[in-house]
Amino acid sequence: MSTVHVVAPVAVHSVPPAQLLPQTATPPAYAQTLGGEAASTLAQKKKSPPLSANKRKRSETADDSTDQESNTPSRKSRDGPKKKKANRACFHCQKAHLTCDDSRPCQRCIKRGIANNCTEGHRKKAKYLLDDEELEELKRKQNTVPSRKSEPRTEKPKPSEPPAQTAQAPAAPLPRPSLQAQAQPVPISAPAPIPASTSEPFAPNDPMFNLTFDSNFPFGSEAANLEYTILSAILGNPSPPDTTSPPPQPYPWPSDTLSFNSPQLDSFSSFPENVLPVISADNLLSSTGSLNYLQARTAKQQSTADPADLQCGDDASKYTRDGRCSSPPSFYMDKESAARTLLSPPPTDSPGSATSTVPLNEVAPFPRPGSHLQSITDRVKAPYDYTEGYHFLMKHLTTRFEKNDILRVVRALAIFRPSLIALQMPLSWDDEVFVERCFQRSLLELDKLISYSGTPTVVWRRTGEICLVAPEFCMLTEWSMEELMGQKKYIYELFENQSVVEYWENFAEHAFENTTQSVYSHCVLLKPSGAPVPATFCFSIRRDLFDLPSAVIGQWLPLL
């Protein structure tokens, strides 16, 4: 049977009937039909507050705020007043992305000791904040930069040129120098007079500032072409006149007018492939003008000129329309002597010339490196025979050394000779020719290095044959350069017997070692008279492309 709970009556005089039970309350009849457990569960649900969407958050009381402050850590208080944000930072603080202030100089710059340089920083304005005038100025700047890059260079004729030459001179081909830059060693008309009171070194209308840019020079960049044009103009024009002296008088040209077929223009318009135009500065600066220069160059080149050139007269004033030579005069030099023309100006017989009087046949050799390389290729047609050097060594040992010394040298040769033979076996004829050309090429570089050093130096092959000798070595040993270089001379012929044995033993030990290391030893050199010259000795071994010892560089210092 179900248990029936009797509920005591409650006075409800002051409570309205609607508020007596909630809307979700269970009817009493239904509660009576439930069991005990279900009734207790229902009572607990009635005690819990109903969920509503408009539930408000409980306002914090003073006790709650004190609890939260006690739980959170207290912040560190600032020392002094809070820094005010600056309207605009100075240049240094802006660059370093540091905080600045409104004072100038700012405190940070004062601490860093750069208060004198504390200035307002530059702030770039956004495009949408720019005014119409500022936008137009910005567009104008952007348009001027590419227009300057794409603007072609316009050629202007030099003020000193005659109208006939500018109009009738043909355009020079690509490998030919500029006619306007080099065809005028002396201006035809007198330059504009410069006032004596001016302080500028050059006049504003000086032709040097109005050079014609010629793109026909065979260089890869415009800067190199312009530089070559300026250098050509410097060599082709006299120096600026003195401000205190009157301007020089113009030099007269031949009486007839220059035409397209005149010899003066023909000499500049015909450029063979194997010659280079060279203009001497001393002749151009001489007081006799450009005609003396033509006379000097013609007299200089008579020995090497073509037969057709020799038929022409030496005097440049004879070049008229009636008496014109079919070929230009000998005005240029070949490639080998082009480099030394500026160093040794051509001689002339004119009394007013300022050039040096060097005999025609006494010209210091100053060939170009390209001619040396070409001569090496033309000269070296077969590989070098090293067996001849070893045969001479064996003959020299038997005539000069004792048996024990000969055995020591032979043992040293037996150490590295098998390695040389093994490395030479796979080489072909062309490989050996290439090795010899490389050796001759390396001698050019070594000759240059020896000229920079004041130490007695000799370069020889692995067989001992001398290839290069420094003048200091000749001074040390009293051997002449002709005796050492003119005929086959071996380095061990200049050594004392003990030094020869020690050299070959050291060479056998270091022939295939590191080439960056040098061998230091004591050596006794012999003069032509047989007098000994004790010295300290060091040598290093250079190997070729196939790892064969090719060149030996030795240096000596005398023991005083």
Swiss-Prot record:
GO terms for cellular component: nucleus. The keyword Nucleus applies. Residues 148-159, 315-324 have a biased composition (Basic and acidic residues). The keyword DNA-binding applies. Residues 442-515 form the PAS domain. One of its GO terms (molecular function) is zinc ion binding. It comes from the Eukaryota. Transcription factor which regulates nonfermentable carbon utilization. Activator of gluconeogenetic genes. Belongs to the ERT1/acuK family. This is Transcription activator of gluconeogenesis ERT1.
